[in-house]
């Protein structure tokens, strides 16, 4: 019975890998990581007010960052955003 469970687990994990692997190769990934410049703006979880810049798909836009959490589509200056997302 123990070998059957192990084989079932291996089969399940193999199928899961085959199903999710194409997502890792999608257009939103670059060199194995999610393309930062395609992420939506995310204020984060705190209530601070830091002016930051993000790329909204077509232009560089200001938003208020709360100081904690959020995602990596957040830059301290427009110039820093342009340097990272120039090819987006």
Curated annotation (Swiss-Prot):
GO terms (BP aspect): envenomation resulting in negative regulation of voltage-gated potassium channel activity in another organism
Cellular localization per UniProt: Secreted
Tissue spec. comment: Expressed by the venom gland.
Residues cleaved off as propeptide: 28-33
Listed Pfam families: Kunitz_BPTI
GO CC list: extracellular region
Ranges where the BPTI/Kunitz inhibitor domain occurs: 37-85
The UniProt record lists the keyword Repeat: no
UniProt keyword Thylakoid, yes or no: no
Signal sequence segment: 1-27
Keyword annotations: Disulfide bond, Protease inhibitor, Secreted, Serine protease inhibitor, Signal
Disulfide linkage: 37-85
InterPro entries registered for this protein in UniProt: Kunitz_BPTI (IPR002223), Kunitz_BPTI_sf (IPR036880)
A molecular-function term among this protein's GO annotations: toxin activity
Site label Reactive bond for trypsin, positions: 47-48
Family: Belongs to the venom Kunitz-type family. 01 (intermediate) subfamily.
Descriptive protein name: Kunitz-type U15-theraphotoxin-Hhn1o
């Amino acid at each position: 019975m123990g070998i059957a469970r192990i084989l079932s687990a291996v089969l399940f994990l193999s199928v899961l890998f085959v199903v999710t692997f194409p997502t890792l190769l999608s257009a939103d990934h670059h060199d194995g990581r999610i393309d930062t410049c395609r992420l939506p703006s995310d204020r984060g979880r705190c209530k601070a007010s830091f002016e930051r810049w993000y790329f909204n798909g077509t232009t560089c836009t200001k938003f208020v960052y709360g100081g904690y959490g959020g995602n990596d589509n957040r830059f301290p200056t427009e110039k820093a955003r342009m340097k990272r997302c120039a090819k987006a």
